[in-house]
């Protein structure tokens, strides 16, 4: 029997996260260090320091003083963190770091954990997952063009990646490359290693990730044997470990943003008058808010259901695909209706809603566009 009862302890943690984001993080949303390419490193460090002081930093990773939480519990807390796009940044549960911490926690050896994972968990450095390429390796990673060749006891990597989130300034790098004779392989190295070239930061419609999204070139990147992450040729299998949880945490965070956008739209509908009464009393507005509330609750329950599947020890690939496809599409509709309810204010930066609209539009592509998930779902249905 599925039971989504929120315990008093979980409710208290949720309320603490929500209060922290509302009281400490939201005031930074209009900070000049919020750039067209996302928050600067300086702003991120200041926010992380606040979360560390509050005892809430990286709450999703179990360690001394931080208890383990289930995927369902994570969903409750991540939604609270998503009240502001800067909330996950401050709390160190934003992409790509959150997914990278999960992956490294599964396959990194003790030395790699100490050097590359622990500093990310502690909020002292950021990480990247360098897979996506301009030639197509993204939704179809088997088109991987970045190569790795053996060089004595080590490796040499060459290739170009793009849309690499947070690359500029990140120190923990997970790189996927096609290793001669073995296939897709993961490597782990420091971002300051010679041969990693940040060509440029791309101009994208979203701006909620530190340092934005970059084009990266690997120019004879020499790595030692110790840079191998896991086993040779196992990158796709390892990526699957990260896949379902990362899809769902994206959904959790954006759900929090949708709840806030709905709250702003509701406040406006109660106070803005037109034709002799508050606009929310006009069906054209009220029905949009009702549709939003229905969609938000549907998304929440689907996320919790998929998380429950993971908590039963299942991989949840099918369930996470369905959830990611539905939630990304429905939350975009929620954002669009909030913009419509707000009218002219909705297309401005007078509220966070326009920014949420831009960000959640990009979410329909992150971790696989909707159509790729629909194809995977249909393939399984027809196979079974």
Where are these regions (language model features)?
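A short, charged helix-loop
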Residues: 214-241
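Flexible, small-/acidic-enriched active-site or ligand-binding loops
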Residues: 143, 194-224
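Alpha-helical interface subdomain recognition
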Residues: 1-87, 94, 107-112, 119, ...
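Short glycine/proline-enriched turns and hinge-like loops at secondary-structure junctions
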Residues: 69-71, 139-142, 166-171, 209-210
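A short, Trp-centered hydrophobic/proline-enriched beta-strand micro-motif
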Residues: 123-132
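Hydrophobic, small-residue-rich alpha-helical packing segments that form membrane-like cores
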Residues: 136-140, 155
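Glycine-rich phosphate/pyrophosphate-binding beta-alpha loops
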Residues: 97, 137, 162-167, 207, ...
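A short core secondary-structure module
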Residues: 145, 158-199
């Amino acid at each position: 029997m599925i039971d989504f009862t929120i315990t008093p302890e979980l409710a208290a943690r949720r309320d603490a996260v929500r209060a922290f984001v509302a009281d400490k993080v939201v005031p930074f949303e209009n900070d000049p260090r919020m750039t067209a390419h996302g928050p600067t490193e300086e702003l991120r460090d200041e926010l992380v320091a606040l979360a560390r002081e509050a005892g809430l930093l990286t709450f999703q990773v179990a360690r001394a003083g931080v208890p383990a939480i289930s995927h369902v519990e994570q969903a409750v807390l991540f939604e609270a963190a998503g009240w502001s796009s800067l909330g996950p940044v401050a709390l160190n549960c934003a992409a790509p770091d959150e997914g990278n911490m999960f992956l490294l926690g599964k396959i990194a050896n003790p030395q790699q954990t100490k050097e590359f994972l622990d500093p990310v968990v502690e909020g002292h450095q950021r990480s990247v997952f360098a897979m996506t390429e301009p030639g197509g390796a993204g939704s179809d990673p088997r088109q991987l063009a970045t190569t790795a060749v053996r060089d004595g006891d080590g490796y040499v990597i060459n290739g170009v990646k793009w849309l690499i989130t947070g690359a500029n300034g990140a120190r923990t790098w997970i790189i996927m490359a096609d290793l001669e004779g073995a296939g897709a392989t993961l490597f782990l190295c420091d971002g300051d290693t010679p041969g990693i070239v940040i060509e440029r930061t791309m101009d994208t419609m979203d701006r909620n990730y530190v340092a934005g999204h970059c084009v990266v070139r690997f120019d004879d990147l020499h790595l030692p044997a110790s840079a191998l992450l896991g086993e040779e040729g196992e990158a796709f299998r390892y990526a699957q470990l990260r896949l379902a949880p990362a899809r769902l945490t994206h959904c959790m965070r954006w759900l929090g943003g949708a709840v806030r956008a709905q709250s702003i739209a509701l406040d406006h509908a109660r106070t803005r008058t037109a034709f002799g009464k508050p606009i929310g009393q006009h069906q054209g507005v009220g029905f949009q808010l009702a549709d939003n509330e229905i969609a938000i609750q549907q998304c929440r329950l689907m996320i919790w259901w998929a998380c429950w599947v993971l908590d039963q020890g299942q991989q949840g690939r099918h369930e996470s695909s369905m959830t990611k496809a539905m939630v990304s599409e429905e939350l975009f509709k929620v954002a669009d209706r909030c913009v419509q309810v707000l009218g002219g204010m909705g297309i401005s930066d007078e509220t966070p809603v326009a920014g949420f609209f831009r960000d959640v539009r990009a979410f329909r592509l992150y971790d696989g566009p909707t159509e790729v998930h629909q194809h995977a779902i249909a393939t399984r249905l027809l196979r079974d």
